[in-house]
Amino acid sequence: SARANAMQEACELQPSTMAAVLGLDNEVVETICNDTQGVVVAANYNCPGQLVISGEVPAVEAACAALSEAGARRALMLPVGGAFHSPLMEPAREKLAQAIESAAIVAPRCPIYQNVSAEPTTDPGVIRAQLVAQLTAPVRWTQTMQTMIADGAASVTEVGPGKVLQGLFKKVDRAFPTSSATLAMEEA
C-alpha cells in the first residue's frame, strides 16, 4: 500500500524503534520523553498504565533506562522496523497525503472515532486530514475508548482476529460489553 511503502522509506532514513512502557502515569512517561536527548515521544496510549514510546534508537534506549529508574514495571524495546506515530515518519506524509486525497471517501452513516483526536466525525475532510496526521501523531486509544463511553456507546465489537483491543477496553472499563467478529477465509 502507499502508506506502507512511504513508512518503509521513512524508516530507512534513520535507525528508529519503539518500546512498551508499563506501570507509569502518562505524564511521567511524557516528561521523561521530553527530557531525553534526541527524538522520543509517546506514540500509543493503549490503556491506563500502558504506553508505547517511539523515536531514535539511542533516545528510546535512554528513555527506557530513565523510565525503569522512575519505577516502570517494564520498559521493553519492541521488535519493530521504525518509530511509528512519531515525528520520524514525517518524510512519509506527502506520499500518504497524495494517496488519501485520491481515495474516494464519503460521509459515513455513523461517526468514525479516529484515534488522532479521540473524537467522532462524519466529515470526509476531517477523516482525510486525520488519516494523514496519524503518521506522526500518537494513537490516543485510551482517550478514544473513554470518549466512546461518554458519548453513550452501548457495546463495542472488535473486528478481526484476536481480542487485543477488547482487552485494552476492559482495562478502561471492566464492565463495558465487548465482543469480537472474525470472518474465516477458505484456503484456495
Regions found by a protein language model. Name each.
Residues 1-137:
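Alpha/beta catalytic cores of group-transfer enzymes, especially the acyltransferase/condensing modules
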Residues 101-188:
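Acyltransferase/transacylase module recognition
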